[in-house]
Each structure stands twice: as C-alpha cells, then as structure tokens.
C-alpha cells in the first residue's frame, strides 16, 4: 500500500526527488520537483510519456515561476486575461525565459502553468513554495483516474506517496490556452 502523506511528508518526498500523487480540479495528478531533472525523468518514465511533450506545472503564484516564464512579454490584455483567471482551473502556455529547463518544457517554446484554487493543490503548492509538476496520474494513453480508488495499483507501486483528498467538480482536465494567441489547445 502506498503511504498517505501529510503536507510535511509530501514536501520531504519532493525535496528528495520523489514522485507523489494528489487530487486536482478534475483528475488525480502526479507531481515532482520540476527543478530536479532526475525527478522529472522518473515521473515521465512511470507514465511512459516522452520528454518532448513537456509537462504542466502548478504553483502558488506566478512569482514563483519568474525565472522560467516571462509573463511581462504578453500584451497587456492577454496578461490581464491570464492573471484574472487565477487562482482557478485555467492552464496557460506562457512565454519562457532561457532558464526554463527543457525537461519541463519539452520541445515547446512555452510552459504550461496553472495557479490552482483546488484546496489540496493550493495547500501543497503553498507548503512546497516552488513549482510542482502536475500531470495526470495514469500511463500515457490510458484514462485518467477520477478517484484515489481508480489509481492504477501498478502506478501506485512506483511512487513515493499520496496526498489524500477529493478531486474538484470539473468533468475534464483543465482547458489549456496559449497566452500569446488566446488559442485553445485542449478543451
């Protein structure tokens, strides 16, 4: 059985390069420290997801991501759209700086970012104080888990713990929009 982690133990696991599962707005997510290449590569290996696809990161505020994203490069109206949508279930592709790691952005010239209002995600990001990878807790191509009970036992056996809680009310994972163009990339 995979350990249930309180916030302090979740932060300790993340600090040590661990991969954890936690509920998000619609589905269960897997997370790790995106600043640690080995942690991200382990998470991608668990999911069988190619690094070229990149990952979403969640954070307690956009300020936590200033080294990686250049929100000021957006037109004022677009920047306002992004900032007024947070915290909330909105994932935006933001322009990156040259310090954004390729193991996080993949082959893209932007970074997918969400400042979540989901209570578990918000509490975890607040306790962690840094960006956190947020990708669905499933193998690539498989349906995402909507409950802890639906998490694949084989996947659970490969991670370092679970932060308990309930998913939010969204029926689908969050919409992804390009902040530069406003284009919807995932609906």
UniProtKB/Swiss-Prot annotation:
A Pfam family assignment: Sua5_yciO_yrdC
Keyword ATP-binding annotated: yes
Domain (YrdC-like) ranges: 4-187
Catalysed transformations (reactions): L-threonine + hydrogencarbonate + ATP = L-threonylcarbamoyladenylate + diphosphate + H2O
Protein name: Threonylcarbamoyl-AMP synthase
An individual GO BP term: regulation of translational fidelity
Task performed by this protein: Required for the formation of a threonylcarbamoyl group on adenosine at position 37 (t(6)A37) in tRNAs that read codons beginning with adenine. Catalyzes the conversion of L-threonine, HCO(3)(-)/CO(2) and ATP to give threonylcarbamoyl-AMP (TC-AMP) as the acyladenylate intermediate, with the release of diphosphate.
Enzyme class: transferase
Keywords: ATP-binding, Cytoplasm, Nucleotide-binding, Nucleotidyltransferase, Transferase, tRNA processing
Superkingdom of source: Bacteria
């Amino acid at each position: 059985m995979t350990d249930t982690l309180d916030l302090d133990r979740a932060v300790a696991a993340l600090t040590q390069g661990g991969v954890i599962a936690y509920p998000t707005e619609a589905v269960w997510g897997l997370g790790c420290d995106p600043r640690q290449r080995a942690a991200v590569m382990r998470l991608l290996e668990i999911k069988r997801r190619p690094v070229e696809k990149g990952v979403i990161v969640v954070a307690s505020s956009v300020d936590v991501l200033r080294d990686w994203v250049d929100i000021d490069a957006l037109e004022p109206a677009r920047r306002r759209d992004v900032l007024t949508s947070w915290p909330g279930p909105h994932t935006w592709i933001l322009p990156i700086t040259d310090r954004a790691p390729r193991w996080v952005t993949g082959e893209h010239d932007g970074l997918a970012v969400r400042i979540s209002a989901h209570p578990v995600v918000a509490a975890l990001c607040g306790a962690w104080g840094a960006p956190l990878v947020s990708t669905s807790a499933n193998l690539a191509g498989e349906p995402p888990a909507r409950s802890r009970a639906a998490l694949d036992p084989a996947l659970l056996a490969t991670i370092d713990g679970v932060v308990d809680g309930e998913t939010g009310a969204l029926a689908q994972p969050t919409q992804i929009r390009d902040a530069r163009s406003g284009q919807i990339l995932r609906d």
